[in-house]
Amino acid sequence: MTKLIVGLGNPGEEHTEDRHNAGFWFLDVLAKQLNSRFESEKRFHGKVAKAKWEGEDLFLLKPSTYMNLSGQSVGALCRFHKITPAEILVVQDELDLKPGTARLKLGGGTGGHNGLKDIQAHLSTPEYWRLRLGIGHPRDLAGDGRPMDVADYVLRRPQLAEQKMIDASIENGLQILPLFLKGDTQTAMMELHSKA
């Protein structure tokens, strides 16, 4: 059973609306649904909300480190609460998926995502679940044949139409979460992947 859901993003008001903070957006909606509130926890280098799911503790974590150091936060909480990699779901922005698309995946590479790289380094394994929220790739949006800088792209706010699609993918992820949390990962994946 999943004991920890991590949303990836960067701290600070200046990053609140960045595409790179899609994981934070997901956790903010989930915490509200679970009537949980985030509290700063220095020992975990992040903001933590604790909820109950089917009588079990469920931790929600938003690292307060910058994206590249997310593993420091995840590792600290997992060691303290004895949470294994298989009991973790990391919610992340995904350049290689179009806005409006969400995908569940166990393990695999990092796709160049620095937050995932650091988590993998701290957990010593890639074998944890990821919920990938599509934000699109700048090569798909430039339109004028010139490449757009990826770092610049992820640290910008999406256009309104894109934001609506990302919000829809967050909603789709939340809809399959009960199936996922009770361990029916295959059905959760099939339902989510059929939605776009």
Swiss-Prot record:
Major enzyme class: hydrolase
SUPFAM superfamilies: Peptidyl-tRNA hydrolase-like
GO molecular function per UniProt: peptidyl-tRNA hydrolase activity; tRNA binding
Active site: H20
Catalytic activity, reaction form: an N-acyl-L-alpha-aminoacyl-tRNA + H2O = an N-acyl-L-amino acid + a tRNA + H(+)
Cysteine disulfide links: none
Gene Ontology biological process: protein quality control for misfolded or incompletely synthesized proteins; rescue of stalled ribosome
Residues noted as binding tRNA in the record, renumbered to the chain: H15, Y66, N68, N114
Keywords linked to the UniProt accession: Cytoplasm, Hydrolase, RNA-binding, tRNA-binding
Subcellular location: Cytoplasm
GO cellular component: cytoplasm
Residues with site note (Discriminates between blocked and unblocked aminoacyl-tRNA): N10
PROSITE patterns: PEPT_TRNA_HYDROL_2
Gene3D superfamilies in alphabetical order: Peptidyl-tRNA hydrolase
EC numbers, comma separated: 3.1.1.29
Database matches in InterPro entries: Pept_tRNA_hydro, Pept_tRNA_hydro_CS, Pept_tRNA_hydro_sf
Membrane-spanning ranges: none
UniProt site positions, description: Stabilizes the basic form of H active site to accept a proton: D93
NCBIfam families assigned to the protein according to its UniProt record, in alphabetical order: pth (TIGR00447)
Family that this chain belongs to: Belongs to the PTH family.
PANTHER family found in the cross-reference section: PEPTIDYL-TRNA HYDROLASE
HAMAP family listed in its UniProt record: Pept_tRNA_hydro_bact (MF_00083)
Assembly and interaction partners: Monomer.
Described purpose of this protein according to its UniProt entry: Hydrolyzes ribosome-free peptidyl-tRNAs (with 1 or more amino acids incorporated), which drop off the ribosome during protein synthesis, or as a result of ribosome stalling. Catalyzes the release of premature peptidyl moieties from peptidyl-tRNA molecules trapped in stalled 50S ribosomal subunits, and thus maintains levels of free tRNAs and 50S ribosomes.
Protein name per the record: Peptidyl-tRNA hydrolase
Organism: Polynucleobacter asymbioticus (strain DSM 18221 / CIP 109841 / QLW-P1DMWA-1)
Gene that encodes it: pth
